[in-house]
Amino acid sequence: MLVLKTFSLFILTALAEILGCYLPYLWLKKDGSVWLLLPAAISLAVFAWLLSLHPTAAGRVYAAYGGVYIFVALGWLWLVDGIRPSTWDFVGVGVALAGMAIIMFAPR
């Protein structure tokens, strides 16, 4: 149960971060409305709050979170940008998630 809770929290955290960065990108590069900055700021605040909910030392959380962030970012690439990740992208995600699991769940 802890594994599912931790992984789900990482996914929500990554989505908040990606959305918080994607909206200013739309404003700056795709001629989006300046009003996109408001939900972007809210999303980044939610991202910071979600990071505080993780049940271990901050440095370990940030290191492990990177693996899940890569997974979610490639999902975003596929679902939002419409670009299917390559085989090597999937291999890289597998390696990153294995690293995340070692960092988060190794006996201490």
UniProtKB/Swiss-Prot annotation:
Residues that span the membrane, as ranges: 7-27, 33-53, 63-83, 87-107
Localization annotation: Cell inner membrane
Keyword Transmembrane helix assigned: yes
InterPro entries documented for this protein: UPF0060
Keyword vocabulary terms for this entry: Cell inner membrane, Cell membrane, Membrane, Transmembrane, Transmembrane helix
Family matches, as PANTHER family: UPF0060 MEMBRANE PROTEIN YNFA (PTHR36116:SF1)
Transmembrane recorded as keyword: yes
Coiled-coil spans in chain: none
Species whose genome carries this gene: Methylobacillus flagellatus (strain ATCC 51484 / DSM 6875 / VKM B-1610 / KT)
Protein's name according to its UniProt entry: UPF0060 membrane protein Mfla_0485
One Pfam family per UniProt: UPF0060
Chief subcellular location: membrane
Signal sequence residues: none
Entry membrane topology: Multi-pass membrane protein
GO cellular component term of the entry, any: plasma membrane
HAMAP family (alphabetical): UPF0060
Family assignment from sequence similarity: Belongs to the UPF0060 family.
